[in-house]
A protein has these predicted regions:
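Catalytic domains of carbohydrate-active enzymes, especially glycoside hydrolases
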Residues: 32-51, 56
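N-terminal carbohydrate-binding accessory modules
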Residues: 1-40, 61, 193, 286, ...
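Substrate-binding/catalytic cleft of secreted carbohydrate-active enzymes
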Residues: 47-285, 289, 296
Length: 299
């Protein structure tokens, strides 16, 4: 289990890619950072996974002072990805618990030696730059096999740079048995319960999509399950929490990460719209399930 201040602590998180409709990777204001963090806290979440991006320093400052935990991704690299492998086949192999070694440089799009060294240099800079933010509790070097390589060496390197924090070595799949967290993504198939001597985390789930036309940037819709009303979205979220997510805690899961904080272009699977004008699910229902999720750790 995760502990915070020597007490068991369930981390109920949200995937946060840090996009805004006017500036994309640039927030419109300092208040925009505060709004996103506070909105997630008000819904009952206590952790944000900053996904595929290093945020402006002010964002981490606000997480520090507002009491929001952070899992920090290293932005992914490598050459063009083989989606049939790192997306479709990987989902099936992950569900079947068939291990895949990170030696397949071509399949994992990491054949370039210069690119691998550049990654090491950049992750060193990231850890050193963000080291003094107490909100950061976990480093995430690789996500879903995107440019993954030498996972154990990279994990050991991060631990040497920063022995005070945890490392989620491979979020999603292609686990190499190293790091502090056994980290899975769940979208389509049954949620596995692997035997592990590491902390078990559901580092992505959900992806439920509802497009509100007057608050969307694109006509296209991307999501793993699509809805046309807030009521239907909320009901399906409740069933997922009741039947799968909350029961997973007694099976050892100690953290969850819902996808995602806000809509992003055609990704209409956010808790709030791209323009931050609408919360798409009933806030009281989301709060209720977050409370049950955290309490289930002690039941």
């Amino acid at each position: 289990r995760f502990f915070l201040n020597d007490q068991p602590y369930f981390q109920s998180g949200v995937l946060d890619q840090g996009y805004w409709p006017d500036g994309l990777y640039t927030a419109p204001s300092d208040e925009a950072f505060i709004y996103d963090i506070r909105a997630m806290k008000d819904l009952g979440f206590n952790m944000l996974r900053k996904h595929g991006k290093i945020e402006a320093d002010r964002w981490y400052f606000h997480c520090d002072r507002m009491g929001m935990l952070v899992w920090q991704d290293m932005p992914n690299g490598g050459s063009s990805y083989h989606h049939w492998f790192v997306t479709y086949l990987a989902t099936l192999l992950n569900w079947m618990r068939i291990p895949v070694k990170d030696l397949h440089a071509r399949l994992l799009s990491r054949t370039d030696e210069f690119g691998r060294q550049e990654y090491i240099d950049d992750i060193r800079d990231m850890v050193r730059t963000l080291y003094n933010h107490p909100s950061i509790v976990t480093w995430v070097p690789f996500n879903e096999g995107w440019g993954q390589f030498s996972t154990k060496k990279v994990t050991d390197f991060i631990h040497r740079l920063d022995p005070s924090r945890l490392v989620d070595s491979a979020s999603g799949w292609f686990d190499q048995g190293c790091g502090d967290i056994n980290s899975l993504h769940y979208y389509f198939l049954g949620l596995p319960v692997p035997e592990s001597d590491r902390v078990l985390a559901l580092s992505e789930f959900g992806g439920y999509s509802l497009r509100l036309p007057e608050h969307s940037a694109c006509r296209n819709i991307y999501g793993y399950k699509k809805f046309t009303t807030s009521e239907a979205l909320t009901d399906s979220f409740s069933r997922l929490m009741e039947n799968t997510i909350v029961p997973s805690v007694k099976n050892g899961y100690s953290a969850t990460v819902f996808k995602q904080l806000s809509d992003i272009e055609e990704e209409t699977n956010g808790l709030i719209t791209y323009d931050r004008k609408k919360i798409k699910m009933n806030p009281l229902i989301v709060q209720k399930w977050n409370t049950k999720l955290k309490k289930s750790l002690h039941s």
